[in-house]
Amino acid sequence: MSPKTLYDKIWDAHLAHEAEDGTCLLYIDRHLVHEVTSPQAFEGLRMAGRKVRAPEKTIAVPDHNVPTTEGREDPAQMTEESRIQVQALDKNAREFGVHYYPVDDIRQGIVHIVGPEQGWTLPGMTVVCGDSHTATHGAFGALAHGIGTSEVEHVLATQTLIQKKSKNMKVEITGKLNPGVTAKDITLAVIGATGTAGGTGYVIEYCGEAIRDLSMEGRMTVCNMAIEGGARAGLIAPDQTTFDYVKGRPHAPKGAQWEAALAWWKTLYSDDGAHFDKIVTLKGEEIEPVVTWGTSPEDVLPITGVVPSPEDFTGGKVEAARRSIEYMGLTPGQKLTDIEIDTVFIGSCTNGRIEDLRAVAEVVKGKKIKSGLRAMVVPGSGLVRAQAEEEGIADILKDAGFEWRLAGCSMCLAMNPDQLAPGERCAATSNRNFEGRQGYKGRTHLVSPAMAAAAALTGKLTDVRELI
């Protein structure tokens, strides 16, 4: 038998049928749904008189539209469109009998944080959701990716998905990271090196010493942004770090089932000699804290750098750089550390976990944020929020001047009350920085939680290494 990659193994284990043209039917182990991409899918089932094929494998949670301020159960806090979507999910989840975490449940939060937290995400699984950042779950050695609304309906009805197999890509991060450099810096550095189309047509497996050294939360951050690199999905082979994280979670296997699952999970790695169609290698010790300067996740530079000139680019990227610089209100040659900000947003499915909040608290403890700055911390779930309060993190953040919010997607995207005003500049721990992502004419700089904390203290983009 020829050597297989991790992706090959998971794909083959879930392949139900393959047509002559390479179109395949895959079995889906977990289907996560939220309020934005599911209403039409459930309505399609209703009109066809169909049931959800596997409600026990379907998990619903509202996250994109929900307000993050107290009293958010009041429908008046939402726009009409948001209210309709949240209420539709509530109705559909109850009617079709899927697992459901409503707004008033402490387990509610961002779907890609709730899934792993509750033990729904396990190694070797296929996981889909009508959301591009489903790649997050690949940190567990699961094949996880986003799907469209018509596909959401197909999975609800059949527990299968039609697709063609992607190619294999390996991204290796060798060596050790230096102090102040985090998983967010890794994933941004990779996108900066490969571009937003570098992974197009591929499933990425992340490996190397720097990846193995990451916690599960760090690995989720890395895989979360595989889609920003153009990939279909991102994977990290499971190991003892993975098993320790999963064990004991509410929906993880127990007893003999755990032992049986563990035996299989330990086979989930790329065999020696397995073929990768593309290989990218970065040296971990050479990665610095980074920040995006433009309107694409590939517009990445070390915090020690300067805003580039359009003439630094070639081809179509010259005009793209010119437009980005103009939109962002920057000047070529300007030091990144001279860029003043108005807002700091810490949260999202990229960086809304307890480890992220600990990193922020470590930087700001005993200090105050810049006067006049708006800074908010939005935990990724109600359980993350409760844990942060129990550990004293919430008090540290509030004492420093941060707004302490309820769980949700919040300012990651302009679909709820948390938005930037036109021209407002934000240091954000989220995953996308295109025009208008956080609000009409808002300006976004993507950074790690530690870097966002540093920016909150100084009022400008700052090298966190100077503060730790």
From Swiss-Prot:
Molecular function terms, GO-annotated: 3-isopropylmalate dehydratase activity; 4 iron, 4 sulfur cluster binding; metal ion binding
Iron is among the record's keywords: yes
Coiled coil: none
Cofactor annotation remark: Binds 1 [4Fe-4S] cluster per subunit.
Xref: InterPro entries: 3-IsopropMal_deHydase_lsu, Acnase/IPM_dHydase_lsu_aba_1/3, Acoase/IPM_deHydtase_lsu_aba, Aconitase_4Fe-4S_BS, Aconitase_4Fe-4S_dom, IPM_dehydratase_rel_enz, IPMI_cat
Binding site for [4Fe-4S] cluster: 349, 409, 412
Organism superkingdom: Bacteria
Keywords of this entry: 4Fe-4S, Amino-acid biosynthesis, Branched-chain amino acid biosynthesis, Iron, Iron-sulfur, Leucine biosynthesis, Lyase, Metal-binding
NCBIfam families: leuC, PRK05478.1, PRK12466.1
Quaternary organization: Heterodimer of LeuC and LeuD.
Protein name: 3-isopropylmalate dehydratase large subunit
Biological source species: Ruegeria pomeroyi (strain ATCC 700808 / DSM 15171 / DSS-3) (Silicibacter pomeroyi)
Taxonomy of the source species: Bacteria, Pseudomonadati, Pseudomonadota, Alphaproteobacteria, Rhodobacterales
